[in-house]
């Protein structure tokens, strides 16, 4: 891995969030107590809460950081042909067992509106949402840039179901000797629950 990439990842890991989360009318905000990260992680939408829950219990996620600093420029063409280069802070910087990079989590309907308004920034290809300028920036460091489009209603129901069986698992963990097996079973259940949404 190039030294520049190692330095970038280190700065993402040890820098405070680029901005504070904001409360918005009609949205859900709060703090998620993460055992994986040993901190409370703020969220400002149901989508972000679902993303945090998923990454918290995903064995393939090593670490994840909200509102990763510093912000960076996204260069793309607007609908009018003008060149835009706004500073941008993705929702998360995620270290996975097979890759590392930035991630955006947005409602599906919001992504469709953004793609119509900024077609060179958000696009859908083969059913997957992408951000070409974000991917271009990440590629400079050998990293990834992922865009997750979610149905808010399905995500909310799945999150509620997920918390229900997670709480049950916590109680059973106190009576089982083989906690490793329990964790493996719960990880499979978590993936099955969330794959219905992804």
Sequence positions of predicted segments:
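Electrostatic, structured charged patches in enzyme active sites and in nucleic-acid/phosphate-binding
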Residues: 1-198
């Amino acid at each position: 891995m190039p030294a520049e990439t190692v330095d970038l990842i280190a700065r993402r890991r040890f820098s405070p969030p680029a901005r504070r989360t904001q409360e918005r009318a009609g949205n859900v905000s709060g703090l998620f107590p993460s055992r994986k990260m040993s901190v409370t992680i703020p969220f400002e939408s149901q989508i972000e809460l679902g993303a945090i829950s998923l990454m918290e219990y995903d064995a393939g996620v090593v670490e994840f950081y909200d509102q990763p600093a510093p912000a960076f420029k996204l260069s793309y063409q607007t609908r009018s042909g003008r060149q835009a280069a706004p500073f941008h802070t993705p929702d998360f910087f995620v270290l996975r067992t097979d890759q590392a990079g930035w991630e955006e989590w947005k409602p599906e309907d919001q992504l469709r509106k953004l793609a119509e308004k900024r077609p060179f920034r958000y696009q859908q290809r083969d059913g997957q949402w992408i951000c070409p300028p974000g991917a271009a920036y990440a590629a400079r460091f050998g990293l990834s840039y992922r865009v997750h489009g979610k149905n808010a209603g399905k995500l909310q129901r799945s999150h509620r179901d997920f918390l229900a069986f997670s709480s049950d698992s916590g109680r059973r963990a106190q009576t089982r000797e083989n906690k490793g097996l329990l964790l493996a079973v719960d990880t499979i259940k978590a993936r099955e629950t969330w794959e219905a949404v992804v």
